Swiss-Prot record:
It comes from Clostridium beijerinckii (strain ATCC 51743 / NCIMB 8052). Keywords: Methylation, Ribonucleoprotein, Ribosomal protein, RNA-binding, rRNA-binding, tRNA-binding. GO terms for cellular component: small ribosomal subunit. Part of the 30S ribosomal subunit. Contacts proteins S8 and S17. May interact with IF1 in the 30S initiation complex. InterPro entries: NA-bd_OB-fold, Ribosomal_uS12, Ribosomal_uS12_bac. Belongs to the universal ribosomal protein uS12 family. The modification 3-methylthioaspartic acid is found at D89. GO terms for biological process: translation. The keyword Methyltransferase does not apply. CDD domains: Ribosomal_S12. This is Small ribosomal subunit protein uS12. One of its GO terms (molecular function) is tRNA binding.
Length: 125
């Protein structure tokens, strides 16, 4: 335990918190252009074909982002908005593509959790 005079001389070091989404540079979202759109398989206990895109951001970073929801309309040169948030069973995927923003369409026929997938409220019959 330090003495008071040692604390006056040096002070306490604050622990540096490492960012989970460094490519965003403290921004809530960033715009980018898809360079590759493909599927990949998840880690060991899970099995699927997860849709991902390699995105070149406006700040020069190139990141891998997950495309959530059922079906998508993305291809190379699509302009997308990405947010932070990793995918636990895909190593290296630390970003999500925002559905319903820029070139990425919302999920069709989505009735629950619509705001997370950019789906409009369905018309009443």
């Amino acid at each position: 335990m330090p003495t008071i005079s040692q604390l006056v001389r040096k002070g306490r070091k604050t622990a540096v918190v490492k960012s989970t989404a460094p490519a965003l540079k403290e921004c809530p979202q960033k715009r980018g252009v898809c360079t590759v759109v493909k599927t990949t398989t998840p880690k060991k206990p899970n099995s699927a074909l997860r849709k991902i895109a390699r995105v070149r951001l406006t700040n020069g970073f190139e990141v891998t982002a997950y495309i959530g929801g059922v079906g998508h309309n993305l291809q190379e040169h699509s302009v997308v908005l990405i947010r932070g948030g990793r995918v636990k069973d895909l190593p290296g995927v630390r970003y999500h593509i925002v559905r319903g923003a820029l070139d990425c369409a919302g999920v069709a026929n989505r009735l629950q959790g619509r705001s997370k997938y950019g789906a409009k409220r369905p018309k009443k019959k």
